[in-house]
């Protein structure tokens, strides 16, 4: 079976950047900050490419939503090995349900039979889009995938659970969300990076997809975690035991 794979990706603050909270606590500073593809989505792109390299897929479509700068993230996916990209251009703050609704409309247009995406984005950690999209499409889903095997018209997904591993089998079409242990994403070759800059991207909008992106959730406050106090050196095991007793920990 030759698959058509849709891979949703998100542009986020780079994982190596030290996050700074805005003065009004409405969010984090993103101006003049290095941005990159969500790490979980990189894994999704890599897995789609590996499936294609096994001659199990004919096309990989990378999709991203957000302002025009999101096109850079799509081009990164193309440089890695995706075949084409779709940009849903919007400046609105998209919540998981809105993202899922937009993806559903794209699925109806593009007709993929496998969707692979990161289990969550590192900026909001919602971990909701895959599940919501599966509900809207009425497709089977396997979340937190650490191994993916495709046989005929079925997908076998191994996922880590408390105390062991769980393997699920699904009929296509299906949705998979990726965990960090699934694979290690490749670096794009320079020649592919240069080619991706000239790649033509298909542009949609929430309006062209007939999706209302009004927010039903409101962020009340974003705060930095409290700073950790320094540790105390102890001279012996007896002193450790005494300190634990003092704080009623034993």
Curated annotation (Swiss-Prot):
GO molecular function, one term: electron transfer activity
Record Pfam families: ETF
UniProt-listed CDD domains: ETF_beta (cd01714)
UniProt-annotated location(s): Mitochondrion matrix
Co-factor binding comment: Binds 1 FAD per dimer.
Cofactor(s) of this protein: FAD; AMP
A GO biological-process term: fatty acid beta-oxidation using acyl-CoA dehydrogenase
Keywords: Electron transport, FAD, Flavoprotein, Mitochondrion, Transport
Annotated function: The electron transfer flavoprotein serves as a specific electron acceptor for several dehydrogenases, including five acyl-CoA dehydrogenases, glutaryl-CoA and sarcosine dehydrogenase. It transfers the electrons to the main mitochondrial respiratory chain via ETF-ubiquinone oxidoreductase (ETF dehydrogenase).
The protein's assembly and partners: Heterodimer of an alpha and a beta subunit.
PANTHER family cross-referenced by the UniProt entry: ELECTRON TRANSFER FLAVOPROTEIN BETA-SUBUNIT, ELECTRON TRANSFER FLAVOPROTEIN SUBUNIT BETA
Protein name: Electron transfer flavoprotein subunit beta
Natural source organism: Dictyostelium discoideum
Gene: etfb
């Amino acid at each position: 079976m030759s698959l058509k794979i849709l891979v949703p990706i998100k542009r986020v603050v780079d994982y190596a950047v030290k996050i700074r909270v805005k003065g009004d606590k409405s969010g984090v500073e993103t101006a003049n900050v290095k941005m990159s593809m969500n790490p979980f989505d990189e894994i999704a792109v890599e897995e789609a490419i590996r499936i294609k390299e096994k001659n199990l897929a004919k096309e990989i479509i990378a999709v991203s939503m957000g302002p025009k700068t999101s096109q850079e993230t799509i081009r990164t996916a193309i440089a890695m090995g995706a075949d084409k990209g779709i940009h849903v251009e919007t400046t609105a703050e998209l919540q998981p349900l809105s993202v899922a609704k937009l993806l559903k409309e794209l699925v109806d247009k593009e007709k993929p039979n496998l969707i692979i995406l990161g289990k969550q984005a590192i900026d909001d950690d919602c971990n909701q889009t895959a599940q919501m999209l599966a509900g809207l499409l009425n497709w089977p889903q396997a979340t937190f995938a650490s191994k993916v095997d495709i046989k005929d018209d079925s997908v076998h997904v191994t996922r880590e659970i408390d105390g062991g591993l769980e393997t699920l089998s699904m009929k296509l079409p299906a949705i998979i969300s990726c965990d960090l242990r699934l694979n290690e994403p490749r670096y794009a070759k320079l020649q592919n990076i240069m080619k991706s800059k000239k790649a033509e991207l298909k542009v949609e909008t929430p309006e062209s997809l007939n999706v209302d992106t009004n927010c039903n959730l409101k962020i009340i406050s974003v705060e930095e975690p409290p700073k950790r106090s320094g540790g105390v050196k102890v001279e012996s095991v007896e002193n450790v035991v005494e300190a634990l007793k003092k704080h009623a920990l034993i």
